[in-house]
Design a protein with these regions (language model features):
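Acidic, metal/ion-coordinating pockets
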Residues: 4-315
Length: 317
């Protein structure tokens, strides 16, 4: 009888243990699934913007000759840096603000083909045009586009009746996780800066009007973040249209990634637009010495929250 009681008690204890273990296991599994889902949801609300400007055909790093920039830049180190960021961050956009061409013998000899191929290899998502991108002539730029897997965005140049007709776009919309991003491009006035025979019948249009019109289209299409790739230059003493004026005189642009003036910003500049909203402007010098990085987290605020920004020095090891 005692033996039967002992066996029965052991059986009951085993059932309790199995039941409790199953419950605990289910709770642990549910907790793990919830944590995984929460992590995935958080990742879908985060976006990393990487950007360059005025690389000027600098495919190789500066030589180790004792100069200030020795060992800096070069597509190999930039590609490795971009790849490492993509491995740690799911949603990344890689952008360029113009003056891809001119500045080294590579352009003199190959007219931009290796530059476009290098950017394609690195997975650039979009770029705009700078004045030096016309240095080989508008026909040459149109020819080199066959080597680019990314779009050239520019909304204030009318390329009708030129070799670039229907080969650029005013904007493009990207979907990264739950975030919808609209990107537009702006170019500087070419007259007086570029010989007319190099840009042909290209018509320059007011960048403020063009930017407001294009950004309004992007806003109406539900974009959570609107980025302008600008080759206007950051600011001028003579009142010439610049990124500073653009930021203040537009309504829906959130971030301006600039070029032309070769400024190394330590942190993005902040301006207030016509709707009293914050606009960030950033620029990372020239020659591919730095890679700009701006991180957004849209899970914190519906309008988006910048959580970090930095310029990363590209140095060869």
């Amino acid at each position: 009888m005692q033996k039967l009681k002992t066996e029965l008690l052991m059986s009951i204890n085993r059932r309790k243990f199995i039941k409790h273990t199953a419950v605990a296991g289910s709770a642990l599994l549910a907790s793990t699934l919830i944590n995984d889902e929460a992590h995935a949801a958080a990742a879908n609300n985060k976006l990393t913007i990487l950007h360059t400007n005025d690389v000027h055909s600098r495919l190789e790093p500066f030589p180790m000759d004792g100069s200030r920039n020795q060992g800096m830049g070069g597509v190999a180190a930039r590609a490795a840096l971009v790849e490492s960021i993509r491995k740690e961050t799911e949603h990344v956009l890689l952008l360029d603000a113009g003056d891809i061409f001119q500045g080294t013998p590579y352009f003199n000899m190959y007219k931009g083909e290796p530059e476009m191929k290098a950017m394609t290899m690195m997975g650039y998502d979009a770029a705009t045009m700078g004045n030096h991108d016309f240095d080989g002539g508008i026909e040459n730029f149109a020819t080199q586009l066959q080597h680019a897997s990314f779009p050239i965005l520019i909304c204030n140049y009318d390329f009708s009746n030129t070799p670039l007709e229907n080969k650029t776009a005013p904007y493009k919309i990207f979907q990264k996780g739950k975030i919808k991003i609209g990107i537009l491009g702006l170019g500087i006035e070419l007259e007086g800066l570029v010989p007319q025979n190099l840009y042909g019948k290209t018509i320059y249009q007011d960048p403020i009007l063009a930017a407001n019109k294009t950004a309004d289209i992007l806003k109406k299409q539900g974009c959570d973040l609107i980025i302008c790739l600008s080759h206007l230059g950051d600011k001028y003493d003579d009142g010439k249209i610049s990124d500073e004026i653009l930021a203040k005189e537009t309504e829906n642009i959130d971030l301006i990634l600039g070029g032309h003036t070769h400024r190394f910003f330590e942190i993005p500049r902040k301006y207030t637009n016509k709707k009293q909203n914050e606009v960030l402007v950033n620029q990372v010098g020239w020659a591919g010495i730095q890679l700009g990085r701006i991180d957004y987290d849209f899970s914190l605020y519906s309008a988006g929250k910048r959580v970090a920004s930095k310029s990363i020095l590209i140095r060869n090891k």
